Amino acid sequence: MKTQALKGMRDLLPAEQTLRDYIQGKILETYRASGFERISTPMLEDMENLDKSDGGDNLNLIFKVLKRGDKLTAALNSGDPKQLSDMGLRYDLTLPLSRYYAANRDKLPSPFKVIQTDRVFRAERPQKGRLREFVQCDIDILGDSSPNAEVELIDVTTRALLNIGFTGFTVNINDRRILRGMLESMGFAADTLDSVCITFDKMDKIGADGVKAELTEKQLPESAIHALADFIAAGEVTLDAVAARCADPAIADDLKYVLATANALADGRYQVAYCPSLVRGQGYYTGMVFEITCPQFSGAVAGGGRYDNMVGKFLGTQVPAVGFSIGFERVCGILLEQGYQIPGAKQKIALLYGRDADFTAVLSKAAALRDTYQVTVLPQGKKLGKQLGQLEAAGFAGAAFMDKDDVKIF
């Protein structure tokens, strides 16, 4: 039998799980203090729903579940690979939320401010910062079309990061509608814009040359590709310059409002920036998009945007929706590398007792010590020195004994 976890998935030791529990607890505390409510959805979703979710390249990373019994036999006999699966593991929390809202809309407030902290799955090539099973911490607002929803999500998400000691980050903001207008003005056809945006979003992974090569492979107009390459090469581009290519000035006004308001709320604690190349890879985004980046990590540690058409796929009527997701694994990884310590955590000690000890008295003493310490009761070993060394190596701060009043701190 193999003892290692599957590639891209991890076993967590107690110390790391304790830190993760604390970080997730602080994030949830911030979300709940802002009036958001937590829900839960199944890990498995209908395969047809997943296929129609406009998830961009994530649709190629779905863990699919084979049909069972006679249905599998019939699917195999059909010769069509698409018939083999009827369900799959969720790749993010947006599609499940949209389905959940459509199913429960009559029981939910409007606007609906919701929390999801749960596991998602992608058939990634495992590497640092990219796992096949990972946790996302999402907040979403459904039923509010105003830019105040974007501002609130940015405010709450950044406060959550600040509350766990995360600093030095930048909130990057763009609007897909402005970007689409710019791309159309460069010569890309309207029906190719989603594909162009998905490629453009890979800029930080494959670079400008990679973007150009991928667009060329898609057989898009050479003149449009060169125009986009020139735009990328130009470096810093102002919002006014890009917005001039957009047909609706109100879109640019909303983006300016969000940038200005978010910057005022930041109050110098983090940066807020317009990022003309920000796209986000998921195809379901319809308006503003945002990401949080930091110097300690090459990719985004949080991201989100507006997805006004997703719920409508289930209901047949459009419901405005916008969400922001913290990349929990990446944030935890950065904090661990920085040697993060849980503020105000009680020291962990062991209460050692002899084999003839009255166990009622042992547990009573442990209860008294827990006013000051986190206490684990353990039988005392024959070689006390060796046992104390093992406890220290395991992260214990000290030990207490039944026949002594003081605590031995290592």
Q: Language-model segments: what does each one mean?
A:
Residues N58-A74, G187-V211:
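Acidic, His- and aromatic-enriched active-site or binding-groove loops in soluble protein domains
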Residues M1-Q4, L183, F188, S195:
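Charged, compositionally biased N-terminal leader segments and the immediate start
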